[in-house]
């Protein structure tokens, strides 16, 4: 289809044959939702062709080739009519229809609570419709004197910063590392990537149209958060290479007294009216103490503190744990190691993806 800027309505000018060829690689369940929108045919949601409950990475709904052909034919007719009638989009489906479409897509009943979120994600309603309502009656002159300190410049800390900027509330971010991005700055082990679809692992108001993979790798994610911080002018509010060592609430002054340690070890302090902890849940690696470990002569490292200066080529390597990091790390290490041993406490929960 003809490319335009994100968020701008796209017009179809391609021939029937080109459209048909494009449909061969499209997700069939997604096509069915597009047909419902373009034609208003909600009977499709109650028809015989239905996707099965999806698993990670499966985008065709486990439909057979005959069913796929039927849907592609319907989609071709819908797109031809849309093109020939001037590419005028019909009204967006209402909340009840969206809910029915959601149930259809996932093969089970989706709780009502998810509908408003999904409609916002698809820009069918105003984004963040309640943003700012909590401080709407507070004069700007009062807001500008309310100081907020955010601990951490990962994805949560950056989001908090942007929201505070929008509300006219001053802030500072204290970040222990040398860059933004949190876990995507610190984690550098081989194969490091997100295990959630990339377009979900981004801010709803700041989608990226540059993801090169469904499950983006670490460098791409880090670049996304760096661009976000630069675009929104957050960097100038960040104190890098500084760690929060203590925070004490002063009831009399209604302020937080925050103790800091700089890159050279110098201790300083700051005062804030509000304190936001955005340190994340896994920002400090937990390394088990194993009996006899002191006698081990080889290299020992945690995946969260990967040492790129250590070569694993031709080595006998042991990996302890089979969590998400191991899923990504082990296949990469196996390419270099002479022998690889994996020790697990519990069976893995991921399905093979040949």
Annotate each PLM feature.
Residues 159-161, 165-182, 189-194, 212-214, ...:
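N-terminal cofactor/phosphate-binding cores enriched in small/glycine residues
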Residues 1-148:
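Rossmann-like nucleotide/phosphate-binding core characteristic of flavoprotein oxidoreductases
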Residues 17-18, 22-25, 32, 185-227, ...:
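Glycine-rich active-site loop/strand segments that organize a redox cofactor
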Residues 200, 238-239, 298-301:
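Conserved beta-strand scaffold positions in the cores of enzyme catalytic domains, especially
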Residues 138-145, 149-166, 170-180, 185, ...:
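Rossmann-like dinucleotide-binding core of oxidoreductases
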Residues 184, 211, 249, 256-257, ...:
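Tryptophan-centered motif/residue detector
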Residues 63-112, 117-122, 213-282:
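Feature captures the FAD/FMN-dependent oxidoreductase FAD-binding
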């Amino acid at each position: 289809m003809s490319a335009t800027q994100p968020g701008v309505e796209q017009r179809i000018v391609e021939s029937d044959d080109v459209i048909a060829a494009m449909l061969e690689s499209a997700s069939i369940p997604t096509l069915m939702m597009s047909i419902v929108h373009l034609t208003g045919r909600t009977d499709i949601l109650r028809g015989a062709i239905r996707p099965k409950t999806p698993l990670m990475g499966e985008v065709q709904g486990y439909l057979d080739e005959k069913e796929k052909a039927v849907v592609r034919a319907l989609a071709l007719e819908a797109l031809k009519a849309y093109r020939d009638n001037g590419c005028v989009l019909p009204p967006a489906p209402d909340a009840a229809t969206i809910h029915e479409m959601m149930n259809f897509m996932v093969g089970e009943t989706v709780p009502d609570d998810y509908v408003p979120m999904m409609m916002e994600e698809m820009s069918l309603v105003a984004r963040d419709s309640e943003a700012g309502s909590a401080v709407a009656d507070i004069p700007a002159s009062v807001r500008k004197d309310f100081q907020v300190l955010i601990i951490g410049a990962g994805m949560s800390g950056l989001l908090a910063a942007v929201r505070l900027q929008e509300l006219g509330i001053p802030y500072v971010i204290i970040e222990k590392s040398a860059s933004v991005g949190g876990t995507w700055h610190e984690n550098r082990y081989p194969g490091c990537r997100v295990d959630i679809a990339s377009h979900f692992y981004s801010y709803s108001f700041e989608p990226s149209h540059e993801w090169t993979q469904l499950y983006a790798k670490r460098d791409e994610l880090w670049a996304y958060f760096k661009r976000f911080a630069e675009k929104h002018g957050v960097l100038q509010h960040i104190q890098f290479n500084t760690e929060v060592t203590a925070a004490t609430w002063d009831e009399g002054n209604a302020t937080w007294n925050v103790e800091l340690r700089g890159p050279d070890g110098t201790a300083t302090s700051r005062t804030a009216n509000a304190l936001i902890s955005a340190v994340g849940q896994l920002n400090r690696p937990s390394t088990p103490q194993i009996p006899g470990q002191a006698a081990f002569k080889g290299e020992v490292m945690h995946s969260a503190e990967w040492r790129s200066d250590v070569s694993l080529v031709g080595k006998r390597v042991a990996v302890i744990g089979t969590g998400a990091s191991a899923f990504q790390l082990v296949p990469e290490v196996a390419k270099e190691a002479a022998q690889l041993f994996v020790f697990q406490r519990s069976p893995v929960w991921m399905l093979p993806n040949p």
